Amino acid sequence: MKSADPGVKIPGGTDFGKNTCLISDYLHSTGGNYNLSQPCVNIGMVGHVDHGKTTLVKALSGVWTDTHSEEVKRGISIRLGYADSPFMKCPKCPAPQCYTVEKTCPNCGEKTEEHRIVSFVDAPGHETLMATMLSGAAIMDGAVLVIAANEECPQPQTKEHLMALDIIGIKNIVIVQNKIDLVSREKLVENYHQIKEFVKGTVAENAPIIPISAQQNINIDVLIDALETQIPTPVHKVDKPASMLIARSFDINKPGASIDEIRGGVIGGTLTEGVLHPGDELEIRPGIKVTTEGSTKWIPIVTTISSIYAGPTKVEEATPGGLLAVGTYLDPTLTKGDSLTGQIAGVPGTLPETRHQFVMELHLLDRVVGVTREEKINEIKTSEPLMLNIGTATTVGIVTSARKNEAQVALKRPISAAVGAMVAISRRIDSRWRLIGVGVIKS
């Protein structure tokens, strides 16, 4: 099928980039193989519902990531949102005043210079959308934990999201005390001490706490300074075969488009290692479900890359770091409505096997977090359904065998994962999926 170039702003709150990344340290560490036209790092926005995550992304990037119809109507994030932001630096002003997202320094009027581009992953904070948050956490290099100053701390999903960061292994964290314009100084100090007490003994114990107002753009320079210090650009393996976690997929064609106007399916996500170019062959696993003569199996998809975009910027080479939109020659019906979300794309023959079941080593939490009554977590039992997050994939697994520190699960939907891959485990508690621990795939 012939596909035109899919270089457009992707719908669904997804704007995959704006300008150029200029990180000299990263260039040296990768031997100059870093693509200067794409973001360098993925930073997650996490925290309780309505604490200002999406507003903060807007303040940093100019992109309002809630564009899905239900998101607009309900005023909450439902899907993962994405936006890229260039961090600019004034050559004359000292830190933190030197940092801004503007092309002109708001302090001295000097023309600013591009420092680096970051991709923000806006995760929903509602308790019913924990699976979406966990799939977003899989592509985060660091996170901003947003806590509203006008509410008691911690709120249920503040606790659950911090626990998720800890379990998944995200250690580079900045805490934002948002909505400081809505409270008195006394209340602000009280809330600050609540935050300090809450994070004591956690992965975020030593994280800086930055008081801001995303709505009024207060202390945004201080926040950028903290992000530059606390969440460095990671060094990725560009000499390995390309592997990409798919976080979104789209059909970007408008209804009524003619045959000549139809563009191939688009996948969005992050490249974890290797390099991609237009013209490269791409395998996607597990692929598509095919039923013949009463037998069902999953068949990997093989396609060719037609174009690669970091935001509106078309690139001829994509390296790890930040979010990408990859145009393909796939039938767009295969990619519409996030139908390939959770799959892995990469060099044919190099991807992990497709698993319909696996055995995992268990590491359960002591107590359930994110609920009013934090009850003890019981051992996993045979025949119990569990929600499992592996990379950007979410599936349900039925426990077929369980011991104290090990369980075998049969998956409702297969995943592509290697031995040693980490699995976030959630259990149905009070009609909600609650995070109860982490597993490691053994076989």
Swiss-Prot record:
Gene Ontology BP terms: formation of translation preinitiation complex
UniProt-annotated binding residues for Zn(2+): 90, 93, 105, 108
Cofactor(s) recorded in Swiss-Prot or TrEMBL: Mg(2+)
UniProt domain tr-type G: residue ranges: 38-235
Class of the enzyme per the UniProt entry, highest EC level: hydrolase
Chain intervals for the UniProt region annotation (G4): 178-181
PROSITE patterns according to UniProt: G_TR_2
Alphabetized InterPro entries for the sequence: eIF2G, eIF2g_C, eIF2g_dom_2, eIF2g_GTP-bd, P-loop_NTPase, Small_GTP-bd, T_Tr_GTP-bd_dom, TIF2_gsu
GO MF term set: GTP binding; GTPase activity; metal ion binding; translation elongation factor activity; translation initiation factor activity; tRNA binding
Annotated Mg(2+) 1 binding sites: 54, 77
Positions of region (G5): 213-215
Membrane-crossing residue ranges in chain numbering: none
Region annotation (G1) ranges: 47-54
Superkingdom to which the source organism belongs: Archaea
Keywords, sorted A to Z: GTP-binding, Hydrolase, Initiation factor, Magnesium, Metal-binding, Nucleotide-binding, Protein biosynthesis, Zinc
Annotated segments matching region G2: 75-79
HAMAP family: eIF_2_gamma
Protein family: Belongs to the TRAFAC class translation factor GTPase superfamily. Classic translation factor GTPase family. EIF2G subfamily.
Assembly information from the UniProt record: Heterotrimer composed of an alpha, a beta and a gamma chain.
Known role: eIF-2 functions in the early steps of protein synthesis by forming a ternary complex with GTP and initiator tRNA.
Cross-referenced PANTHER family: EUKARYOTIC TRANSLATION INITIATION FACTOR 2 SUBUNIT 3 FAMILY MEMBER, EUKARYOTIC TRANSLATION INITIATION FACTOR 2 SUBUNIT 3-RELATED
Name of the featured protein: Translation initiation factor 2 subunit gamma
Organism of provenance: Methanosarcina acetivorans (strain ATCC 35395 / DSM 2834 / JCM 12185 / C2A)
Lineage: Archaea, Methanobacteriati, Methanobacteriota, Stenosarchaea group, Methanomicrobia
